[in-house]
Amino acid sequence: KKETYNMPPQSALITVMVNAARKASIRLKRDYGEVDQLQVSKKGPADFVTAADIRTEKLLREELSHARPGFGFLLEEAGEKPGEDPHRRWIIDPIDGTTNFVHGIAQFAISIAAEENGEITAGLIFEPINEEMFWAERGQGAYLNDRRIRVSSRSTMAQSLFATGIPFMGRGTEEDHDKFLAEMKAVMSVSAGIRRFGSAALDLAYVAA
């Protein structure tokens, strides 16, 4: 459900996150447009995506460090980087949905969170191809671009769609996978359906919207 009223002005913190995500997305969208050419290249798409991941993370770190010099970082690629301020840090996933990215599916996102004293105070998920910017700040509600969003009023499983991930066959035992498929079957029988979009961050954003 989307609303177009009661929108507070973006805080300085959210503005910093939005600007960083938009700036990093410029190169990321260019990389996405070149993925098809890599299917026949010697380098290969997997190496390309790793490079795009690292490059996007670096850009985000530079932008956020410039705006908030004392914050530390928890990064998907580079790990934990303490800052001068021990109580505040950024948590970044530069490309959530890399498998979609490498196959030319526009279902991936930049994910940024601000943490203070071990608690998340603000978060942003940006799907750059369709320009969907989900953001929220503690006590201020959640938004998609400039519109207020709320969770659905559906209250039963039969009315609801479910999002999930699917484990890779190379991980876990055959018994683990059989159990997962049995659980999927059980949910499918009592719900409106199951979706597997390929980006956990966007799954959560769509639930919020």
Language-model segments: what does each one mean?
Residues 120, 148-150:
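Short, solvent-exposed loop/turn motifs
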